[in-house]
Amino acid sequence: LMKTLVIAEHDNNTLKPATHNAVAAAQAIGGDIDILVAGADCGAVAEAAAAIPGVGKVLSADNAVYANQLAENVALLIADVAAAYDNVVAPATTGGKNTMPRVAALMDVAQISDSIAVDSPDTFKRPIYAGNVIATVQSSDVKKVITVRTTAFDGVPEEGGSATVEAVAAAHDAGLSSFVGEEVAVSDRPELTAASVVIS
């Protein structure tokens, strides 16, 4: 049976809705679904992920090297864990777009970016030319790295599941980057990638 690993989007405290959309995309692909939570002091996130219906288990990589989810470190972890999976799915958010191309390169596969529909386990639809054309892409890679446009998939429920949580001991520090700071712009409007209506 095919196995898919979904990469959780979170801030070490709360699980982001984009994760539920990514799980929905994984369900469309089919097979068993596990979730990887990489962070520091992120136990609450792992428990929230375990409550998602349809998830078999949650892999929790709780280590200081993942505190700020630096793409260089997280990509090494994902590529390591992904050895046991057929597909790796992540939301096409800022974090996903930063990390997943590195994962695809480490796994030596072509990434399927910004998918908006799943036709079959190896065939996906994605927008090109600023959304004016919808391309149907079939992957011949044995393992697939996929980012999904969150607004194209209705999120799965937050409650109802009872997945087990397993600790992942691997701590990958690439030593290539360091966290300097973060400036968060506060807005009462949703993020563009999560907005149900966009007016331009």
Question: Across the structure, where does each feature detected by a protein language model lie?
Answer:
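N-terminal glycine-rich FAD/FM-binding segment characteristic of electron-transfer flavoproteins
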Residues: 1-200
